[in-house]
């Protein structure tokens, strides 16, 4: 059922060409981005080929999401078919899943990373003490991290919720719980150390050095200041995930309203579960329960504590989905029938709202692609006309288009204009055009029109940016917004360069 629901939610994306800014640089890519620490991503994405194939990648992604839901259901020993369906639907329609499909060329790899993270927790259950399963858990976390580091948090939050469930069930002694925690520390320490060693070894053998993307080059350089900044950033990220800045900016939408209600519901069911299980009668268990709740915030964005240059976004916060899932599980276990039904209806509404958000996003991606195609076609026609009289060696793009590329749509009934960011979560990543630099321009035109353009080197761009000829040019689409300067075809979109 998870497979079908996820497929239906994202069918618009899977059956259309809806690229984002990164996609047009990845029509075909082996995803061998070892410099970013993702040494297993190429292998994971290779399962569906290295082409950006929306339908095939979508099917693989749905499969991995479904298997992840199966693992979670097995972990918490759930047998209610409605709850099982709801768990799969929450994962398939989560904000993290939606944004991951923006970058669909790696989506199947990232969903495999999520599955491995879930398996790691399942293999390290409190009643599972076989060394082979500990080894499987270590390898799953190591590989998950090697595909996409953000899914380490998915494993951590899932493990925390599983441990909370253990504490509430009163099935294990204090010593059993302590032994399980020690086992987790060992498993995560060994797996992350192994990940780091493999990464360093592969870079040494290939001669590649780490890049600065998301602060990966600073990984391992920890200090007290970093711990303080990491805690502050993790708290901020946790809050903004639920509010999406809307309240703080004087705006509110359905996404934020649902999340506020969810937080209230989560607090209520936590109190109910503590009272019903009489957890307060075991002080050591209550203390561990409290520590688990506190740990959720830093664990959800754990990489803040390893580098000060990382920036979290929705696709890196799939771990938050576990909080929704476990809240549903708590209502199933401890709430009265009327509250169970109410919670079920609420989370179905959350899934529906997330599905609407997904498709609104895809609607804007479609507009973006059509605008880009039309704009690039005009650029190609202008270039052909210019080539009749002049020649050039490379192309340079001037002007940061993102400042004036935000979507606005007119309500034909009220005649009011609305900004895209008010209606969907990821407005910051959808622009009116996919073309934002010389590389994206040349690659899009070469793939779609067969015209090969060589992007100018940075030194050439720097020299031209200081020239009076560029300053005297008008901005696109003016007739003289395209000009050959010292053998370089210059296209000036605006004065922000």
Q: How does the language model describe each region?
A:
Residues 1-35, 39, 45-67, 76-88, ...:
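Intrinsically disordered, polar/acidic, low-complexity terminal segments
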Residues 154-189:
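Perimembrane helix-loop-helix junctions
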Residues 131-135, 332-358:
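Signature aromatic-anchored transmembrane alpha helix within multi-pass, membrane-resident enzymes
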Residues 91-92, 279-305, 349-351:
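Transmembrane alpha-helix segments characteristic
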Residues 34, 38, 61, 82-125, ...:
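Membrane-interface micro-motifs in multi-pass membrane enzymes
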Residues 117-133, 166-172:
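Membrane-interface transmembrane helices that cradle and orient dolichyl/undecaprenyl
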Residues 243-285:
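Hydrophobic, aromatic-rich transmembrane alpha-helices
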Residues 133-149, 154, 160:
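Membrane-interface alpha helices of multi-pass inner-membrane proteins
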């Amino acid at each position: 059922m998870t497979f079908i629901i996820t497929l239906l939610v994202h069918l618009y994306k899977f059956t259309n060409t809806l690229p984002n800014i990164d996609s047009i640089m990845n029509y075909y890519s082996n995803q061998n981005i070892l410099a970013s620490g993702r040494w297993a991503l190429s292998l994971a994405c290779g399962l569906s080929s290295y082409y950006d194939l929306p339908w095939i990648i979508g099917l693989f992604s749905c499969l991995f999401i479904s298997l992840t839901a199966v693992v979670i259901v097995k972990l918490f020993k759930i047998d209610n078919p409605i709850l099982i369906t709801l768990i799969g639907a929450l994962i398939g329609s989560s904000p993290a899943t939606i944004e991951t499909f923006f970058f669909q060329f790696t989506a199947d790899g990232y969903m495999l990373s999520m599955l491995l993270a879930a398996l790691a927790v399942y293999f390290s259950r409190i009643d599972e003490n076989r060394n082979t399963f500990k080894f499987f858990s270590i390898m799953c976390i190591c590989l998950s991290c090697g595909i996409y580091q953000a899914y380490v948090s998915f494993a951590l939050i899932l493990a925390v919720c599983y441990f909370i469930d253990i504490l509430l069930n009163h099935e294990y002694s204090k010593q059993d719980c302590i032994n399980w925690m020690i086992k987790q520390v060992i498993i995560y320490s060994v797996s992350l150390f192994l990940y780091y060693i493999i990464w360093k070894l592969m870079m040494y053998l290939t001669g590649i050095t780490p890049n600065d993307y998301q602060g990966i080059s600073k990984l391992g350089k920890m200090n007290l200041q970093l711990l303080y900044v990491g805690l502050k950033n993790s708290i901020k990220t946790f809050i903004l995930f639920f509010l999406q800045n809307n309240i703080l900016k004087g705006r509110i939408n359905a996404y934020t309203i649902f999340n506020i209600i969810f937080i209230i519901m989560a607090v209520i069911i936590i109190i109910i579960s503590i009272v019903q299980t009489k957890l307060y009668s075991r002080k050591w268990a209550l203390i561990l329960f409290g520590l688990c709740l506190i740990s959720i915030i830093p664990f959800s964005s754990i990489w803040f504590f390893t580098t000060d240059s990382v920036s979290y976004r929705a696709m890196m916060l799939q771990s938050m989905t576990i909080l929704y899932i476990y809240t549903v599980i708590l209502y199933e276990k401890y709430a009265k029938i009327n509250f169970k039904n109410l919670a079920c209806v609420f989370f179905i509404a959350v899934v529906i709202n997330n599905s609407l958000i997904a498709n609104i996003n895809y609607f804007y991606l479609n507009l973006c692609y059509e605008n880009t195609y039309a704009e690039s076609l005009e650029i190609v026609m202008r270039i052909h006309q210019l080539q009749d009289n002049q020649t050039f060696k490379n192309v340079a793009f001037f002007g940061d288009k993102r400042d004036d590329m935000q979507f606005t749509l007119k309500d034909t009934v009220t005649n009011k204009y609305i900004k895209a960011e008010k209606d969907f979560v990821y407005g910051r990543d959808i622009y009116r055009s996919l073309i934002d630099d010389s590389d994206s321009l040349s690659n899009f035109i070469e793939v779609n029109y067969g015209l090969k353009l060589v992007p100018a080197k940075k030194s050439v761009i720097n020299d031209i940016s200081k020239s009076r000829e560029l300053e005297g040019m008008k901005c696109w689409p003016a007739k003289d917004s395209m000009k050959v300067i010292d053998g370089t075809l210059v296209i000036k979109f605006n004065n922000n360069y």
